[in-house]
């Protein structure tokens, strides 16, 4: 009898189920999503006037190229979804038809929208739909998927977020390797307190406009599997 009880106690499946249904496991698998829905809905309602003004502002600044940017991104378990962001660059091209460098296409309005992180606000729609969470690893480009190591790929075990643990510790000013380590740390430590801490640090960084991009670049250098 004692041996049977010990076997049940050491059963990894039963332990994982218990962890999911208690403590922070319950937050991770139920309350986190509930908070995402409630907060994103209220935020969209409150911020609607701001979103409307920025939409019109960017439409004219982008010379008719539109105010929104939609792109395929991998979400939880690698499932592809359309991310929504404010468009901060024009579609201007050179004589051969190639897009001009990012630095030349980034408008003054777009630069302001980026530096204040306003460009991320439309992702509240993705959060409401369930594609994303308020807090989690940032959703990156689809072409990065085959470049991840097995450990780095663990970042897709949770929904991607508007902000995350990596954004609190350097954002675009740290290497990809460092960023992925921080992402995986978050996956292993999802909790209400961690998410509250991320929100607090994110607000402070946004107000200070800290760690927006690497010095001298409009966008961060792409991931190549080794950097």
Region spans (language model):
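A hydrophobic, helix-centered structural microdomain
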Residues: 19-91, 198-227
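Flexible, Lys/Arg-rich cytosolic regulatory linkers and terminal tails that connect or flank
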Residues: 1-27, 31
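Short, hydrophobic secondary-structure boundary micro-motifs
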Residues: 54, 68-69, 98, 135-137, ...
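Positions in alpha-helical segments
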Residues: 40, 69, 107-111, 143, ...
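Short, glycine-rich, amphipathic interfacial segments at transmembrane boundaries or analogous
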Residues: 4-11, 66-105, 163-181
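A short, structured surface patch at a secondary-structure boundary
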Residues: 102-159, 199-202, 206
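An acidic site on a long C-lobe helix of protein kinase domains
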Residues: 30-33, 49, 105, 117-123, ...
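C-terminal terminal-structure detector
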Residues: 2-6, 22, 157-227
């Amino acid at each position: 009898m004692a041996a049977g009880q010990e076997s049940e106690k050491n059963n990894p499946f039963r332990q994982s189920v218990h962890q999911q249904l208690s403590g922070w496991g319950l937050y991770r698998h139920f309350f986190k999503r509930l908070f995402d829905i409630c907060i994103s809905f209220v935020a969209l309602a409150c911020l609607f006037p701001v979103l409307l003004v920025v939409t019109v502002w960017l439409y004219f600044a982008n010379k008719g190229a539109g105010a929104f940017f939609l792109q395929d991104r991998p979400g939880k378990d690698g499932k592809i979804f359309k991310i929504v962001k404010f468009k901060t660059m024009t579609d201007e091209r050179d004589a051969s038809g190639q897009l001009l460098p990012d630095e030349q296409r980034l408008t003054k309005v777009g630069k302001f929208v980026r530096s204040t992180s306003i460009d991320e606000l439309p992702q509240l729609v993705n959060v409401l739909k369930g594609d994303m969470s308020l807090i989690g690893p940032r959703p990156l480009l689809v072409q990065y998927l085959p470049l991840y190591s097995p450990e780095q790929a663990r970042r897709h075990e949770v929904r991607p977020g508007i902000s995350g643990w990596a954004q609190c510790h350097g954002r675009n000013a740290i290497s990809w390797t460092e960023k992925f380590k921080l992402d995986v740390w978050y996956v292993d430590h999802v909790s209400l307190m961690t998410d509250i801490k991320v929100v607090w640090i994110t607000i402070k960084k946004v107000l200070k406009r800290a760690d927006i991009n690497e010095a001298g670049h409009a966008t961060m250098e792409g991931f190549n599997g080794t950097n």
